[in-house]
């Protein structure tokens, strides 16, 4: 996992980034979750090798967080639902986290670029941020010019 974000989440405003430890703001009774957001897949074998593997790695690396997942593709969620597998979208997953008593949430997308999916995710989070004491969104893999230069 290439994100040092999970416990050292980026809180940004006006284009500046400030590293702060989300866990340091937890008080007695607070609960922290890491919501992994994926586009999704309808292929069970692919899901096991990719999405499930990423979620498992997050569980291993960040045991202080409850790891949850959400999918962004409505088409994939609908196809999975027809087969009896329900996947929550980000707004549903955030509402469920609130219902389950979580107070601090980091949302990390597995999107590669900062495109339409990330913009939609930002809107979901903005509309629900009042539900939590703290909620943060991690950057996609390729976010800064430096990120692109590293893979060029």
PLM region descriptions:
Residues 4-152:
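Extended amphipathic ligand-handling, pore-lining, and cofactor/metal-binding catalytic surfaces
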């Amino acid at each position: 996992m290439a994100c040092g974000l999970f416990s050292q989440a980026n809180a940004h405003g006006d284009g500046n980034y400030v590293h702060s430890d989300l866990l340091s703001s937890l008080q007695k009774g607070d609960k922290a979750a890491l919501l992994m957001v994926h586009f999704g897949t309808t292929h069970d074998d692919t899901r096991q090798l990719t999405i499930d593997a990423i979620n498992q790695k997050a569980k291993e690396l960040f045991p202080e967080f409850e790891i949850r997942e959400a999918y962004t593709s409505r088409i994939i969620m609908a196809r999975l639902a027809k087969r009896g597998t329900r996947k929550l979208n980000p707004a549903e997953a955030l509402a469920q986290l609130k219902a389950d008593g979580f107070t601090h949430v980091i949302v990390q997308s597995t999107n590669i670029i900062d495109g339409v999916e990330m913009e939609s995710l930002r809107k979901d989070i903005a509309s629900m941020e009042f539900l939590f004491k703290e909620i943060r969104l991690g950057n996609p893999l390729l976010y800064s010019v430096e990120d692109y230069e590293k893979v060029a």
